[in-house]
Design a protein with these regions (language model features):
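Conserved AMP-binding/adenylate-forming core of the ANL superfamily
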Residues: 20-64, 68, 72, 89-94, ...
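Structural core segment of the AMP-binding/adenylate-forming
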Residues: 6, 76-147
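Gly/Ser/Thr-rich phosphate-binding loop
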Residues: 252-255, 264-335
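Conserved AMP-binding/adenylation subdomain of ANL enzymes
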Residues: 191-206, 213-279
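Flexible, low-complexity linker/hinge segments
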Residues: 1, 116, 136-167
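Conserved AMP-binding A3 loop
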Residues: 30-34, 168-194
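Short beta-strand->loop structural element characteristic of the AMP-binding/adenylate-forming
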Residues: 58-60, 67, 71, 75-106, ...
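Conserved pre-ATP/AMP-binding loop-to-beta segment of ANL
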Residues: 15-18, 130, 150-172, 179, ...
Length: 357
C-alpha cells in the first residue's frame, strides 16, 4: 500500500465527505475529498507535463488548502516533496532549497517578498508556483497554482504510481550539531506509519490541525492518517487564534505538543471556579473535543488527569522524523498516563541504560 493507494481509496469511500475546512474572510470554506484529490491530481499531472518527474519540489508556507493539495500532488507522483519551515529567515530557506537540490518551489503569498532572493540565489530553481489563484507583476519563471492545474487538467498523461522505495518527502529537522539535516522518507515509510497507528475515527470526524505543517507529526498523523479515516481536517490560520478556531470548528480530535496543552491548562486554571466544567469546555474547546494526541516532548501526567475532568482523553506517544514519525503510542483502550504507550506492530525498540535508543 502506498500513499496514493490510501488517498484513492479514501476518495472511493468518502468522496462527498468534507475533507478540508478553513476560514476565508471570516466565513468557513470547504472542499470534499473528491475536490481535494482532483486538485492534487491536477498538480501531479501538471508537474509531469512540465518535465519535473523525478525532481525535488520545495514548499514554503503556512497551512492552507493550496499547500496540502500541492503536497499531495507531489508525493502521489514520481516527485519528492521538500516542505520547509515558513518561519525560517530567508537566507536559511535559500540554503535548504539548494542543499535539497530543488528544481521547483510552491510559495505562499505571504512569502512574496522572498521571491526575488530565491530566484537570484537558488540556481537550480526552474519554476515557482505561487499558492494563489492569480498573480500579477511577477518575474519570469513565476506562475500561479491555477496555471499549473490548468496544464494538468489538459494533460493526456498521468504520472506513474511511485515505487515503495521511492523517496516521497524530505523533512528537515533541527540538527544537534550545526546545520539541520534532511530526513528522507520513502513511500513505504509514510504509508506503513499511517496503517500501523491503530486509531480509528468515523467519517466526518472533525480534526483541527494546529501543528506546523512542515513537521512529520502534522503531515502524517493529521493529514495522511486523517484522510485515511475520512476525517474533516480544519486549518488553524494562526496559533494566536487556536482557541477561537476551536470554538468555530468544534473539533472532536486534535494533535498538540505538550506546550499547547500547558497553555490551555493555564487558561482553564485561571477561569472562575464557579463556572460549570461543561460550560467552560464548550467555551474553550468548542464542546465536542474528546481526544488529544500528543508527542514531541514529555507531558506531565498531571495534565492528563486534569483534562479528564473535562471529558478529554490525552493520549501520549513517542516518535521521531526518521521513523515517519510514530514509534509508540497510547490508545483509547490502553492509556497509561506517564508512559509513551506500546510500540507499533512494525517497530522494534531497543533500550540501553533505561533509555530508548
Amino acid at each position: 500500500m502506498l500513499v496514493r493507494n490510501i488517498l484513492e481509496e479514501s476518495v472511493q469511500k468518502f468522496g462527498e465527505v468534507k475533507a478540508v475546512k478553513w476560514l476565508k474572510k471570516k466565513e468557513i470554506s470547504e472542499r470534499s475529498y473528491y475536490e481535494i484529490m482532483e486538485n492534487a491530481a491536477s498538480v501531479r499531472k501538471g508537474l509531469l507535463a512540465e518535465g519535473f518527474e523525478g525532481k525535488h519540489i520545495a514548499l514554503i508556507g503556512t497551512s492552507s488548502v493550496e499547500w496540502i493539495e500541492s503536497y499531495l500532488g507531489i508525493i502521489t507522483g514520481c516527485t519528492t516533496a521538500v516542505p520547509l519551515d515558513a518561519a525560517l529567515p530567508c537566507e536559511d530557506l535559500v540554503d535548504l532549497i539548494n542543499r535539497s537540490d530543488c528544481a521547483a518551489l510552491f510559495l505562499s503569498p505571504k512569502h512574496r517578498p522572498y521571491l526575488e532572493v530565491f530566484l537570484a540565489n537558488c540556481p537550480g530553481l526552474q519554476k515557482v508556483w505561487m499558492l494563489q489563484e492569480e498573480v500579477e507583476d511577477v518575474p519570469e519563471k513565476v506562475y500561479s497554482i491555477n496555471e499549473l492545474r490548468n496544464i494538468g487538467n489538459n494533460a493526456s498523461k498521468d504520472a506513474a504510481c511511485p515505487d515503495a522505495e521511492d523517496i516521497a518527502t524530505i523533512i528537515f529537522t533541527s540538527g544537534t550539531t550545526g546545520k539541520s539535516k534532511g530526513v528522507m522518507l520513502t513511500q513505504k515509510n509514510l504509508a506503513s506509519n499511517v496503517e500501523a497507528v491503530k486509531i480509528s475515527a468515523e467519517p466526518g470526524t472533525v480534526m483541527l490541525s494546529v501543528l506546523p505543517i512542515h513537521h512529520a507529526f502534522c503531515l502524517v498523523m493529521d493529514w495522511l492518517k486523517g484522510f485515511s479515516q475520512g476525517a474533516t481536517l480544519c486549518i488553524n490560520d494562526s496559533l494566536l487564534h487556536m482557541v477561537r478556531n476551536m470554538s468555530i470548528f468544534k473539533p472532536d480530535i486534535m494533535l498538540m505538543v505538550p506546550m499547547m496543552i500547558e497553555t490551555i491548562y493555564k487558561r482553564l486554571a485561571a477561569s472562575d471556579p464557579a463556572i460549570p466544567k461543561q460550560v467552560l469546555a464548550e467555551k474553550v474547546f468548542g464542546g465536542k473535543l474528546h481526544t488529544i494526541f500528543t508527542g514531541g516532548a514529555h507531558l506531565d501526567p498531571y495534565y492528563i488527569e486534569y483534562f479528564a475532568q473535562y471529558g478529554i482523553q490525552i493520549l501520549e506517544g513517542y516518535g521521531m522524523s526518521e521513523c515517519s514519525p510514530v514509534i509508540s503510542n497510547n490508545t483509547p483502550e490502553n492509556n497509561k498516563p506517564g508512559s509513551i504507550g506500546k510500540p507499533l506492530e512494525n517497530v522494534e525498540v531497543r533500550f540501553e541504560n533505561e533509555e530508548i535508543l
